[in-house]
């Protein structure tokens, strides 16, 4: 099974269109959205082409393949316009081997700017904590939580490490993919 993992769209129609083109090309079985879908938040500058009303139908067209969690910039009003559940703080997936993928935005569990999770939930050894929030790509073993893999796809629209990106999980491995400008 192939998962495309994206986070921190923040209402950018331009970058959502780029993401949709990537989804068309990648043909994932499921799309994981790690929160902060429509609103840019008070600490972020407006992303390129900030038009949440254009983002809504783009995401709704993919609703049957989306698994989403709530970000710190998501609100109940977002659920009124999105055709897939978006208000859960976390979700859990299991890959073909039984490996647990714990999906969360990250803010609830203390995602830090230095590739850390302050309050990781108790997970079986070999599990992966898949999170967003920091807008920085991560793909590494946790030093603070032995046996836990950390993966952050970075940000679709407001990267803090220079490159707009998403992630892929397939065959037990995570990877980052850079979204190119048109």
Where are these regions (language model features)?
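Beta-strand-turn-beta hairpins that frame and shape the catalytic cleft
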Residues: 1-3, 92-102, 143-150, 171-175
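Core catalytic region of metal-dependent phosphoesterases/phosphodiesterases
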Residues: 2-95
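Active-site neighborhood of phospho(di)ester-bond hydrolases with catalytic His/Asp-centered motifs
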Residues: 5-7, 31-36, 66-72, 102-105, ...
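Active-site-proximal segments of metal-dependent phosphoesterases and phosphodiesterases across multiple
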Residues: 42-50, 82-123, 160-161
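Short, well-ordered coil/turn elements that cap or connect secondary structure elements
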Residues: 61-63, 88, 96-98, 124, ...
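Conserved beta-sheet core of the metallophosphoesterase superfamily
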Residues: 84, 107-181
């Amino acid at each position: 099974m192939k998962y495309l993992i994206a986070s921190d769209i923040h209402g950018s129609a331009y970058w959502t269109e780029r993401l949709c083109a990537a989804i068309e090309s990648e043909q994932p079985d499921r799309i994981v959205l790690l929160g902060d879908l429509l609103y840019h938040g008070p600490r972020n500058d407006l992303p390129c082409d900030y038009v949440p009303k254009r983002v809504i139908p783009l995401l709704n067209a993919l609703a049957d393949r989306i698994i989403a969690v709530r970000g710190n910039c998501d609100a109940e009003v977002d659920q009124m316009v999105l055709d897939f559940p978006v208000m859960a703080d976390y979700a859990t997936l299991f890959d073909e081997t039984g490996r647990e993928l714990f999906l969360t935005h990250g803010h609830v569990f203390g995602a830090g700017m230095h590739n850390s999770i302050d309050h990781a939930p108790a997970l079986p050894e070999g599990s992966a904590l898949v999170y967003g929030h920091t807008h920085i790509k991560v793909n590494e073993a946790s030093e603070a939580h032995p046996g836990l893999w950390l993966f952050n796809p970075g940000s679709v629209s407001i990267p803090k490490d220079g490159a707009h990106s998403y992630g892929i999980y397939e065959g037990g491995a995570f990877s980052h993919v850079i979204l190119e400008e048109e």
